[in-house]
């Protein structure tokens, strides 16, 4: 695995949603590095990728309330454990659970294993509220998928907050989730 600058030189065979991700980043003047790899479905499978990226690798979780009327995309450092009750209390929501794959595809054009903050570029009607754990913001860089799980990106955290999220029209809410005991 090798870290490359920017989009692939040859995008043939790549999915349109991946190419749209590169188009967005390029249009914003965001510098990024990319690594191509086998499908990474779990945080454990991302260990070797993490080493090459040298960035805060985030778990990106699509959550919803019991009625499936409120949806949240949570960015949390990979080493933290997600506790539903803690987050629910912080955001004043009823009990949260993982959203079904149908909502990932409908709102973010993403499938399980590929959930990424960059999928918010497809949420034109703002069905999903972005939640970012404050520890994500402490690193200079963070890693995420370009809406597919066979590549990973290394982006500046400042670019996420100052360029990417504003361009997608979402307002993040910062949360503070404790390390598991």
Model-derived segments and spans:
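Extended, low-hydrophobicity, polar/charged segments
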Residues: 1-181
């Amino acid at each position: 695995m090798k870290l490359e600058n920017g989009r692939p030189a040859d995008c043939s065979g790549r999915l349109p949603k991946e190419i749209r991700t590169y188009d967005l980043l390029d249009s914003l003047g965001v510098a990024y590095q990319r690594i191509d790899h086998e499908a990474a479905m779990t945080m454990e499978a991302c260990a070797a990728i993490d080493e090459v990226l040298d960035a805060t690798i985030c778990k990106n979780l699509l959550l919803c309330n019991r009625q499936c009327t409120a949806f949240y995309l949570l960015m949390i450092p990979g080493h933290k454990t997600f506790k539903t009750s803690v987050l629910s209390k912080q955001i004043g929501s009823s009990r949260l659970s993982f959203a079904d794959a149908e909502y990932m595809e409908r709102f973010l054009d993403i499938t399980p294993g590929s959930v990424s903050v960059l999928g918010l570029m497809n949420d034109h009607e703002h069905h999903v509220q972005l939640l970012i754990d404050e520890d994500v913001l402490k690193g200079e860089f963070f890693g995420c998928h370009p809406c597919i799980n066979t590549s990973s990106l290394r982006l500046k955290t400042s670019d996420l907050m100052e360029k990417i999220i504003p361009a997608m029209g979402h307002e993040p809410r910062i949360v503070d989730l404790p390390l598991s005991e």
